[in-house]
């Protein structure tokens, strides 16, 4: 080529000009890692003969041509032109070679001296092969290409399981050996671990291929990149003989109600009408003390041992004694006893027990006053007269201040049930005021007619977890109190004889309770809970009733909707057949809180699902609890801690603590819903690998045998038993269930909103554990991405934002409108409930002036046209 004689003030070197690699997309850490990996491959590829000899020789052998110009120096030799297709890895691709020579076959390059070098297929870099799938690393705006199967890195092939390092357009990156993994080759036998991974990944990739993943979402694998347990737990020893129940009624030979000092009328009523043949140990100790003595008392006993009757029977017996003395007692004879309970549910339950006891003496009247009910109707009942009053502290304090008909001058008993819970809920000031007002208004009993009643007000404090060193509540209410507890067991007597003192800090659980714990990674929580419930209700009659405790109301709502999905939409419906729904109670109140649990039911054993939390209206909570207690079909109650205190729910066989309790005392009350009155029961708590495993030692402190009384489970064991199948088919079934739930959540804005609210509320609740347990439940240890998968979410945790607060409670008017729509056959909108902030914003926007958007757009268009038009005589200033 002849020299054109152009003078240049710069010199171009001999090194070929190559395109600069530009890594785009993904996080900067992923781009940096990919860049370093590419550079490493360059250094390896240039060391091979097939690529090294491309640059080992001069690209041009032409000599220095004669230079005509001002400078005496020779012009630099010409370099061969290299277009954008020239690769920095030491060669061109097929299209470049063909462009240069026009005659060479695909894969060869003309080096300028007649030599022809062909790339080896095994060593060609990925960016030369031109076969990478869309979404891999983008270089210089060109489409990237994959390497051959045998040698291409895992991060290029794009077949690593989701959950590894994410790069570019969310293709997984993992720096592995350049050999194709076994689970990609697909040649492993069925049932092996890698074969299972292949099937699981096939399900995930099939979900992506079918359009199940939307932009900004992540479909991750269930069984990869899960943290493992850091501690090794010993297997419990098999019991040689079953444990003796610690809260069972005594035998008739040991004690009867008549031997405790109760009248024949009351003792016969208990044995015939209430089917109570003998008292429990705590009832034996408290009834004799409270009948014969007028001292304050502190009753301490484990949960489910009958504390309610322990204080009700002495009160009723001493009031009945007035009638035996010839005094006619009726409802306006005066208020003799006030019983305070921390929650409305416990208040209703105490009133129900009292009503059964008073059937033998219908002239003694008891009633309740608590929040959530009409004050006018309560005032009407108080005006007629009442002898025993069961109340919550807040409502009783309100009536003492504002209701003149409430006369407390004749009060002789003040009972504080669940005293520790009263203090935890912040009722200290109310209790102080109640005690002071009753003390000022009470009159000493000096009449000979009232000899059977205490001469002074007796205060009784009851709790399962109350410690002897609790002083605040004792200073408020108790004076020279007597400590009443059940007779110590033989083991405790032996320990005391040997000089071993009991640990005051340890809480007490019934000995017949079978407690276990499961170490479950965050990603597997949902499928493990599902498998556990499926296994529990697999056979009819194996489990009648179960309770699942969760930390917040939003989580309860989400899981209630999830487990009550229609059976036709279930992936297993085609295999197991259609499940016949059980008969549900017909009531408008409980229409939203009771449904058929299609997800955990089967043909032979349909399950009824209930939900309960504090955000429900009081009448709905009461009706739901009543339906759950009276149901003869298998039931599951999903609830918060509102159902953990004092409620006597019959035939509860299994308690699942899906979210750990906020304190050890809360754990005791939760598991106390089962194994009551000498019956057997099971309890299982979910813990995550890591710091939460330290909670096992706290659980063990509630048992005399320590960790020997606890059973350890893994998530894999529970999932395998729940989903079944041959080999490792259970993992594929669990993966399909998880993907199905995620699709169900994404298909409905309502359910997606519920999942997001449940996720956020769960994280907020996780941060509220008591101070001395926060090192165990550490917020910094939570993997939010894995936890989001347990709520069927595919969003990144940082993008999960729910505006506003929880939806407002449904009023009577709202329920009436919903009932009318249901009668007309109108379906509810698939719309997420609005938060408080959204409603306020909408209210504010009502005051803004209305603006026509079309007019604004037209005005803006005219303004832009005016500024962009050419100069004319009309717009030149």
From Swiss-Prot:
The keyword Ribosomal protein does not apply. Its main location: nucleus. InterPro entries: DEAD/DEAH_box_helicase_dom, Helicase_ATP-bd, Helicase_C-like, P-loop_NTPase, SPB4-like_CTE. It is an enzyme of class 3 (hydrolase). Residues 34-163, 225-251, 803-851 are annotated as: Disordered. ATP binds at residues 301-308. It comes from Sclerotinia sclerotiorum (strain ATCC 18683 / 1980 / Ss-1). It comes from the Eukaryota. This is ATP-dependent RNA helicase dbp7.
């Amino acid at each position: 080529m002849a020299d054109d004689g152009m003078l240049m003030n710069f010199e171009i070197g001999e090194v070929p000009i190559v395109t600069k690699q530009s890594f785009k997309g993904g996080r900067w850490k992923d781009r940096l890692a990919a860049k370093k990996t590419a550079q490493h491959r360059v250094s390896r590829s240039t060391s091979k003969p097939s690529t090294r000899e491309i640059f080992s020789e001069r690209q041009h052998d032409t000599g220095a041509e004669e230079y005509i110009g001002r400078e005496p120096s020779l012009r630099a030799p010409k370099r061969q032109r290299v277009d954008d297709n020239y690769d920095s890895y030491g060669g061109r691709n097929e299209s470049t070679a063909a462009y240069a020579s026009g005659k060479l076959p695909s894969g060869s390059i003309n080096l300028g001296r007649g030599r022809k070098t062909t790339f080896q297929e095994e060593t060609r870099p990925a960016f030369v092969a031109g076969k990478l799938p869309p979404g891999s690393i983008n270089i210089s705006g060109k489409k990237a290409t994959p390497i051959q199967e045998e040698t291409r890195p895992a991060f290029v092939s794009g077949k690593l399981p989701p959950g590894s390092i994410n790069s570019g357009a969310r293709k997984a990156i993992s720096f592995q050996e350049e050999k194709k993994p076994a689970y990609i080759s697909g040649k492993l036998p069925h049932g092996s671990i890698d074969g299972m991974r292949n099937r699981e990944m096939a399900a995930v990739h099939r979900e992506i291929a079918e359009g199940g993943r939307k932009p900004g979402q992540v479909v991750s694998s269930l069984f990869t990149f899960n943290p493992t347990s850091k501690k090794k737990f010993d297997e419990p020893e098999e019991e040689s003989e079953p444990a003796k129940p610690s809260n069972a009624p005594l035998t008739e030979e040991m004690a009867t109600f008549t031997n405790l000092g109760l009248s024949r009328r009351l003792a016969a009523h208990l044995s015939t009408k209430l089917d109570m043949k003998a008292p429990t140990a705590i009832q034996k100790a408290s009834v004799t003390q409270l009948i014969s003595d007028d001292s304050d008392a502190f009753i301490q006993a484990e949960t489910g041992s009958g504390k309610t009757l322990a204080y009700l029977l002495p009160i009723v017996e001493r009031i009945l004694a007035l009638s035996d003395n010839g005094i006619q007692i009726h409802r306006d004879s005066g208020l003799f006893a006030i019983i305070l309970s921390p929650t409305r549910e416990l208040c209703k339950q105490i009133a129900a027990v009292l009503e059964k006891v008073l059937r033998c003496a219908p002239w003694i009247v008891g009633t309740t006053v608590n929040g959530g009910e009409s004050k006018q109707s309560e005032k009407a009942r108080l005006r007629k007269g009442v002898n025993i009053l069961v109340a919550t502290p807040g409502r009783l304090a309100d009536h003492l201040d504002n209701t003149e008909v409430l006369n407390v001058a004749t009060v002789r008993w003040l009972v504080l049930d669940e005293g520790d819970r009263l203090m935890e809920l912040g009722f200290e000031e109310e209790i102080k005021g109640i005690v002071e007002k009753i003390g000022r208004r009470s009159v000493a009993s000096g009449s000979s007619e009232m000899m059977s009643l205490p001469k002074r007000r007796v205060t009784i404090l009851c709790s399962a977890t109350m410690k002897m060193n609790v002083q605040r509540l004792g200073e408020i209410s108790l004076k020279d109190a007597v400590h009443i507890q059940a007779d110590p067991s033989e083991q405790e007597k032996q320990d005391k004889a040997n000089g071993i003192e009991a640990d005051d800090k340890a809480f007490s659980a019934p000995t017949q309770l079978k407690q276990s714990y499961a170490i479950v990674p965050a990603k597997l929580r949902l499928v493990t809970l599902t498998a556990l419930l499926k296994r529990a209700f697999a056979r009819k009659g194996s489990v009648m009733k179960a309770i699942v405790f969760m930390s917040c109301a939003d989580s309860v709502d989400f899981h209630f909707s999830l487990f009550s999905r229609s059976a036709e939409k279930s992936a297993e419906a085609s295999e197991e057949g259609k499940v016949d729904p059980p008969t549900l109670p017909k009531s408008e109140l409980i229409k939203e809180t009771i449904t058929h649990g299609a997800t955990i039911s089967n043909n032979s054993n349909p399950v009824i699902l209930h939900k309960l939390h504090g955000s429900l209206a009081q009448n709905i909570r009461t009706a739901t609890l009543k339906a759950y207690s009276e149901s003869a079909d298998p039931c599951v109650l999903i609830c918060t801690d509102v159902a953990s205190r004092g409620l006597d729910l019959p035939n509860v066989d299994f308690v699942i603590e899906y979210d750990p309790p906020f304190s050890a005392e809360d754990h005791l009350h939760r598991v106390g819903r089962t194994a009551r009155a000498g019956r057997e029961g099971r309890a299982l708590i979910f813990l995550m690998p890591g710091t939460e495993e330290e909670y096992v030692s706290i659980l063990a402190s509630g048992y005399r045998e320590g960790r020997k009384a606890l059973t350890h489970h893994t998530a894999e064991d529970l999932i395998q038993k729940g989903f079944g199948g041959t080999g490792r088919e259970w993992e594929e079934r669990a993966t399909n269930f998880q993907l199905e739930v995620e699709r169900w959540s994404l298909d409905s804005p309502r359910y997606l909103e519920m999942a997001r609210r449940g996720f956020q509320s769960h994280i907020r609740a996780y941060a509220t554990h008591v101070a001395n347990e926060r090192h165990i439940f550490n917020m910094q240890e939570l993997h939010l991405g894995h936890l989001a998968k347990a709520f069927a979410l595919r969003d990144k945790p940082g993008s999960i934002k729910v505006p506003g607060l929880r939806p407002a409670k449904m009023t009577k008017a709202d329920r009436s409108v919903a009932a009318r729509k249901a009668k007309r056959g109108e379906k509810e909108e698939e719309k997420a409930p609005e938060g408080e902030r959204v409603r306020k914003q909408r209210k504010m926007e009502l005051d803004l002036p209305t603006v026509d958007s079309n007019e604004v757009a037209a005005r803006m268009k005219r303004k832009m046209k005016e500024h962009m038009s050419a100069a004319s005589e009309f717009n030149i200033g």
